Amino acid sequence: MLVWLAEYLVRYETAFNAISYITVRAILALLTALFISLWIGPKVIKRLQILKFGQEVRNDGPESHFAKKGTPTMGGVMILFSIGVSTLLWANLANPYIWVCLFVLFGYGAIGFVDDFRKITRKNTDGLIARWKYFWMSVVALVAILWLYWLGHDTDATRLVIPFFKDIMPQLGLFYIVLSYFVIVGTGNAVNLTDGLDGLAIMPTALVAGAFALIAWATGNVNFAEYLHIPYIKYSSEVVVFCTAIVGASLGFLWFNTYPAQVFMGDVGSLALGGALGVVAILVRQEFLLVIMGGVFVVEALSVILQVGSYKLRKQRIFRMAPIHHHFELKGWPEPRVIIRFWIISLMLVLMGLVTLKLR
C-alpha cells in the first residue's frame, strides 16, 4: 500500500524512492510485524484471560502439561493481525501472489479459529469434526491452487524443481494441482501437530519463512535465478515481504510463547502458518526444499502417521506417545531441552536446504 504512496511522494522528495526497493520493504515488514506483535501481545493475552479462553489439556498427556491447563490460547490472532497489517502496508498489492498468500493465511486461520472456539466452549480437546476440518482446508487450498494455476499454467511457475539436479525441471501440468494440494494441506497439519510445546513450532516457522524470503528474492530476480539454475517466477519477489512479515510476527509471538508460555497460538495460528509456508513453497517452486527445511514438521507428522498405523495393524505403539516431542518428554527430557534441540535441528535443516540451491 505504501508503495503507491511513495510513488506519488517521490516527485517531491527522492528519498521516498527507497521504498521501491524490495529489500527495504522486506526489512520494514519484519520490523512492523515484530513491533505490532510486541505491542498488542499483552492486550491480547489480557483479553483472552477475561474471556476465559484457556487451553484444554489431554488427559493422557505428560503430567507436566497439566499445569498448562487454563493458559490463554488462540494467541494466533495476534500473529495473523501482525502479518496482515505489515503485508498490506509494505507489499505491492498489485501483485496477485500477495493476495493468494493472504487468502490461505486467513482462510486456514478462520478454520483454526472455529476449531479452537469449539474446544474452549466444550471444555475438552475435541474441536471441529475431522472430516469437516479437512473439507474446509481442502476448499481453501483448491481455490488458491486453481487461482495460481490460472496465473501461470503455461510458464515456469508450474515446473517441479528437484534439488541437486539443475537440468531436470519437468512441467507438471495438471499434476501441479494435486501436488500443491498435498503441500498446503499437509504443511498446515504438520505445523499444527508440532505446536505442542512452548515455542516449539514458532521458531522453526520463523527460520523456514526467513529462508523462503531469500529464495523468493532469488526466484524473482532473473539474474540470480539463472545463476542458481532455478525458474524465474515473475511475481515471486514480492513474496519476500510476506515471508519477512511472518518472521517478525513469529519472533514477536515467541516473546510471549517462550517457556513457560504466557499464551499459546492455538489452531488459529498453527494451521494458518503451516498453510502459509505451504503456499509460499509452491509459489517459489521449492516443495522439496520445504520437506528438507521443514524437516521438524515432517518428522512430527510422520510420527503420528506411523503411530496410528502401527497400532491399527499390530496393536503396538512405536513411540511412547505421538507426536514425537511427547515421546522425548516421557523419556524424561525436560521440556526446554526438547524445544531447544528441535530448534537446533531446524536451523541445521534450513541451512542444508539453502546449500542445496548451489549444489546443483
Swiss-Prot record:
A cellular-component GO term for this protein: plasma membrane
Entry keyword set: Cell cycle, Cell division, Cell inner membrane, Cell membrane, Cell shape, Cell wall biogenesis/degradation, Magnesium, Membrane, Metal-binding, Peptidoglycan synthesis, Transferase, Transmembrane, Transmembrane helix
This enzyme's EC code(s): 2.7.8.13
Enzyme superclass (EC): transferase
Catalytic activity: UDP-N-acetyl-alpha-D-muramoyl-L-alanyl-gamma-D-glutamyl-meso-2,6-diaminopimeloyl-D-alanyl-D-alanine + di-trans,octa-cis-undecaprenyl phosphate = di-trans,octa-cis-undecaprenyl diphospho-N-acetyl-alpha-D-muramoyl-L-alanyl-D-glutamyl-meso-2,6-diaminopimeloyl-D-alanyl-D-alanine + UMP
GO biological process terms, semicolon-separated: cell division; cell wall organization; peptidoglycan biosynthetic process; regulation of cell shape
Functional note: Catalyzes the initial step of the lipid cycle reactions in the biosynthesis of the cell wall peptidoglycan: transfers peptidoglycan precursor phospho-MurNAc-pentapeptide from UDP-MurNAc-pentapeptide onto the lipid carrier undecaprenyl phosphate, yielding undecaprenyl-pyrophosphoryl-MurNAc-pentapeptide, known as lipid I.
Family as reported in the entry's similarity comment: Belongs to the glycosyltransferase 4 family. MraY subfamily.
Protein name: Phospho-N-acetylmuramoyl-pentapeptide-transferase
Protein species of origin: Haemophilus influenzae (strain PittGG)
